[in-house]
């Protein structure tokens, strides 16, 4: 089988196409969550805790300076505000995926059917077998 034919069969399998659709939808959902966190949730939390803009939170390790040649040396800063926003985005996405998986599992995990009771013929044959063992 040629390489191209094998690749075509691989791509045309249902699981690969489902995965591709899931990746595209996931990317779009990620953008929605990013906008939700950056434009709605973070500003609301910021207002509640005293007008803080979470995306601008940072820790300055070394202030900006001007060197002997007159050039500005930028500050060394750890911008943890964006990191906090990213953690919040992750939590929202993980929770949404958890809910979706939980619903899918609920739909697909149906109660197993009770085992069938053996027919009269089978019961009679078992009785004969058991009596012959004695």
UniProtKB/Swiss-Prot annotation:
GO molecular function, a single term: mechanosensitive monoatomic ion channel activity
Pfam annotation, one family: MscL
Entry GO terms, CC: plasma membrane
Membrane topology reported for the UniProt record: Multi-pass membrane protein
Subcellular location: Cell inner membrane
Keywords of the record: Cell inner membrane, Cell membrane, Ion channel, Ion transport, Membrane, Transmembrane, Transmembrane helix, Transport
Transmembrane region(s): 16-36, 81-101
Broad class of where this protein is predominantly found: membrane
Domain of life: Bacteria
Similarity field: Belongs to the MscL family.
Role according to the record: Channel that opens in response to stretch forces in the membrane lipid bilayer. May participate in the regulation of osmotic pressure changes within the cell.
PANTHER family reported for this sequence: LARGE-CONDUCTANCE MECHANOSENSITIVE CHANNEL, MECHANOSENSITIVE CHANNEL MSCL
Subunit (UniProt): Homopentamer.
NCBIfam families: mscL, PRK00567.1-4
Protein name (Swiss-Prot/TrEMBL): Large-conductance mechanosensitive channel
Gene name in the database record: mscL
């Amino acid at each position: 089988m040629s390489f191209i034919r094998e690749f075509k069969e691989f791509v045309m399998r249902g699981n690969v196409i489902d995965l591709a659709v899931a990746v595209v939808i996931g990317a779009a959902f990620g953008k929605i969550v990013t906008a939700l966190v950056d434009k709605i949730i973070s500003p609301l939390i910021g207002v509640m805790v005293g007008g803080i803009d979470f995306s601008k939170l940072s820790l300055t390790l070394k202030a900006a300076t001007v060197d002997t040649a007159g050039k500005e040396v930028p500050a060394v800063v750890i911008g943890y505000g964006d990191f906090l926003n990213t953690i919040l985005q992750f939590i929202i996405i993980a929770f949404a995926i958890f809910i979706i998986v939980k619903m899918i599992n609920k739909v697909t995990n149906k109660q197993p059917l009770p085992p069938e009771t053996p027919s009269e013929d089978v019961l009679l044959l078992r009785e004969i077998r058991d009596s012959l063992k004695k």
